[in-house]
Amino acid sequence: MKDNPISLFHELESYVRGSKDTLHRYMYACILEQRLADLLLLSRCGVHPDDEDRLAVRLASQRSLCVQAASDLAEGTEEARGSTPAWPDCKVTKSSAAQKRPELLSLVKVMQELRTPECSGYDLCDLEVCREDALHWLRDHADPSSPPVLIGVRTGGAFYAPLWSSALQQRWGNKALYHTVRALRMPSDPGASLYLPEELSILPAAIEPDTDIVILEDQPHTGGTVLELAGRLSAKYRLNKPVWVSSPGRLFQIENGRLAKCSDRIPLNTGTRKRIWQMLGNSEEVAEFLLPKLGLTDAHPADLEAVPYKSVPQWNDPMYRREVPFRINPKKTPFYIRRKSTNEPVVFAKFIGKDLFGDFQFHQLKKFEKYFPDILAYQDGYVMTKYEPGLKEMREMFVNMPSAVTREICQSVSGYWKTLLDSCQISGGHPVHPLADHWQARLGEMEDFIGRKLPYDLDWFERSLHTEWTSSAHVYTSLPYANQYGHWKARLSAGQRLKTYRFHIDSTWGGTSSIEVELASFLLENRVRPDDFRLLVNQVKKEAGSLTIEAVTDALPIACVLQAANLLKQAKDESRLSKELILSEAMQSFEYLQAMKPKLSDVR
């Protein structure tokens, strides 16, 4: 998994180097701690060549840096101190990990991704409250004579544990250390958590009988992740007292194999001004706050209102903390700013994450400005763009427009993948696409849902889904969540000037994908003709030397299964797509693929 010099992670390192923001530096330090801890785990499992002792020393040093950065953050230090450590490369591929230790596949996948923790994406908190959580635990729930063993569960817990350690060092100095462990997924049961003995053995060999253990984790859902870890720790240390669990603002104890809530408070800093996502539901407040930032010189506050793109569920309001599970989740709450007098939308606002993750995402997004409406502002994790009325779906244009127009579309959108390769490339991608294991089950579920058999070539799909993409360029992208044709639009002006748009470029909730699958998804969703297929692939090939038309053709069935999986998801979530719409879309896609298959031999 050797990192490309232009990889996403080196882009992140460069961005943080240019920032003096203490929160940016703190979160990057925690991301780096996770990277080093994962590398040490791979080394101890015999699949990474780096020296264990050297990695262990560097990891201990990095954790000290995390605690210092946590103290700076909690104390309100205005400007970050010290240098930004370099991003450590990794020389492990998924195929080599699979051959030696199949259970490490999920770890290598995690290491390819810039995962947004819940605290920055969809269970928002102000991180500094975690330090107050630790002091609250000391004051109201425990009076230990020795420092507790602090264990953060990577990913989320790695951002909380240093803040606890920083608080506890006020009493115990450098003895208040912390550790992190990675919860992996069992190959035989993806819903179950797995902690490897090679990592648990790094924890203290023994502890005093009255020592407390505190596990730091994102908000527990079922509690399965922390309950499994607590069980392993109880066996390791022969515990005679309950294990504590903390997520931002919350404290639990494990009693009789269950999580019992001890305290709960809204995890927001009361000294911080109100953010947009705290104003949701109050249209006038949102509009009045944003107007000075949007450059709408002809608008008056009384004539503007904020209108949810979707309904704003009450559980997004901090006052509804009693709801379970509770989240402050702006991911679900895009909105328009609209003129009351004309009902005309003028601004569209979408949340892309807060703190370092949102800020870096916005930094990346600006590289794609050519494919965006005009960006008016970025505030509190929301990107606000000029509302663009009258856009046409690109699919409609590929189907109905003359070849001169569709060729121009292909020329225009090819630059999107160039920018993606330049800014979001990762290394060591998937030898076989993740959908390969269960693709027939997914299509079977779709057939059951629509009550029809899908027309597809079983051999072609089986060969495609098990293609090894080891020589491909891989990117971190929004594709797994935003591959529908509705994300691609265009406008042809009266003077025949073409402007193309790609919506939902942000990969805050994204994943890894090969460039072949990226292109195949675009071609399938937009019903691209064979000649345009060839033109687009050859344009992108200029930036991705290993790309071939044959490989993109081989990826088309993957795009079809990916679309089916997303349609099924939308049938179940809040959007609740109708059965009739899903039937129409699925059948058209599979029929398009069947009709295209004999023509693709000419494209090759």
UniProtKB/Swiss-Prot annotation:
Divalent metal ion. It comes from the Bacteria. InterPro entries: PRTase-like. One of its GO terms (molecular function) is pentosyltransferase activity. Its EC number is 2.4.2.49. It catalyses: neamine + 5-phospho-alpha-D-ribose 1-diphosphate = 5''-phosphoribostamycin + diphosphate. Disulfide bonds: none annotated. Its cofactor is a divalent metal cation. One of its GO terms (biological process) is antibiotic biosynthetic process. The keyword NADP does not apply. Optimum temperature is 27-32 degrees Celsius. Keywords: Antibiotic biosynthesis, Glycosyltransferase, Transferase. The keyword Repeat does not apply. Optimum pH is 7.5. Pathway: Antibiotic biosynthesis; butirosin biosynthesis. It is an enzyme of class 2 (transferase). Catalyzes phosphoribosylation of neamine using 5-phosphoribosyl-1-diphosphate (PRPP) as a phosphoribosyl donor to generate 5''-phosphoribostamycin in the biosynthetic pathway of butirosin. This is Neamine phosphoribosyltransferase. The lineage of its organism: Bacteria, Bacillati, Bacillota, Bacilli, Bacillales.
